[in-house]
């Protein structure tokens, strides 16, 4: 089998395509959450805390010298990233919890059908029936 044909079969499998779609949707969702945190949640929170812009929170490790920029530790941006993570984690947790609930409800609605008897079980039942028939004669 040629390398390209093998790769094409791998790439077109259902689970690989599903994974690619999930990654793309996840990236878009991440941008939406980042905007929600940066543009909607953090400004009112900063206002409640006295007009603070979290993006401006930083420690200067080394001041700027001429054309050399300052070295800073942006902990305000880190705080925003923590809010992003918490919101994404909460959304994913909620989605998984909902999916699990729907699966449980579906499983409860559909009673499990008993498995079909194996050939061994069918043969044993036939032997039992033959033995019963011989004893009743």
From Swiss-Prot:
Query: Could you state a single Gene Ontology molecular function term?
Result: mechanosensitive monoatomic ion channel activity
InterPro entries referenced in this protein's UniProt entry, alphabetically: Mechanosensitive_channel_CS, MS_channel, MSC/AndL, MscL_channel
Is Protein transport one of the keywords?
no
Q: How does it sit in the membrane?
A: Multi-pass membrane protein
Q: Where in the cell is it found?
A: Cell inner membrane
Q: Which UniProt keywords apply?
A: Cell inner membrane, Cell membrane, Ion channel, Ion transport, Membrane, Transmembrane, Transmembrane helix, Transport
The protein's assembly and partners: Homopentamer.
**Purpose:** Channel that opens in response to stretch forces in the membrane lipid bilayer. May participate in the regulation of osmotic pressure changes within the cell.
Kindly provide the name given to this protein in its UniProt entry. Large-conductance mechanosensitive channel
Q: What is the lineage of its organism?
A: Bacteria, Pseudomonadati, Pseudomonadota, Gammaproteobacteria, Enterobacterales
Q: Which gene encodes it?
A: mscL
């Amino acid at each position: 089998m040629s390398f390209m044909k093998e790769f094409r079969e791998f790439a077109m499998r259902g689970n690989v395509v599903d994974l690619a779609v999930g990654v793309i949707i996840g990236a878009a969702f991440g941008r939406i959450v980042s905007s929600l945190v940066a543009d909607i949640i953090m400004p009112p929170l900063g206002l409640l805390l006295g007009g603070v812009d979290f993006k401006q929170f930083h420690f200067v490790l080394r001041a700027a010298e001429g054309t050399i920029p300052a070295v800073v530790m942006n902990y305000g941006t880190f705080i925003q990233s923590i809010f992003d993570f918490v919101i994404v984690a909460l959304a994913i947790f909620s989605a998984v919890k909902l999916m699990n609930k729907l699966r449980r409800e579906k499983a409860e609605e559909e009673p499990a059908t008993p498995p079909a008897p194996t050939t061994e079980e069918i043969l044993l039942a036939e032997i039992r029936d033959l033995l019963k028939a011989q004893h009743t004669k």
